[in-house]
Amino acid sequence: MIFAMNHQDIDRRSLMMHRIIAARLRAQPELMAVAHANMARWNCPERGWWQEWSTILSSQTVEEVIQLIEREDEDACRIRQSAPFAGILTPREVWELKRNFKEENAAA
């Protein structure tokens, strides 16, 4: 069976993934260095999303960032779309998460 994802599905999957990232950050706050390294590598301050994340990472505590990425409101959903947390989860973990999400939602 083919599972076509709409925007709500994509947002729910992103929230699920970010909750796992949040748990990892709580257990290992030093992983915030991954986000800082990604921002330095992406270095595009002319982009609004980059500026927003740069401000978030430089002005908020790890716990505040975690609370932000776990929120379910529209603003948090928008912010998660450009989150700099690539590399905190392994490619295998991301693949398994996506597969599990697809299987759970295809059955619904």
Language model: regions and residue ranges:
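Basic, alpha-helical nucleic-acid-binding regions used in initiation and control of genome expression
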Residues: 2-108
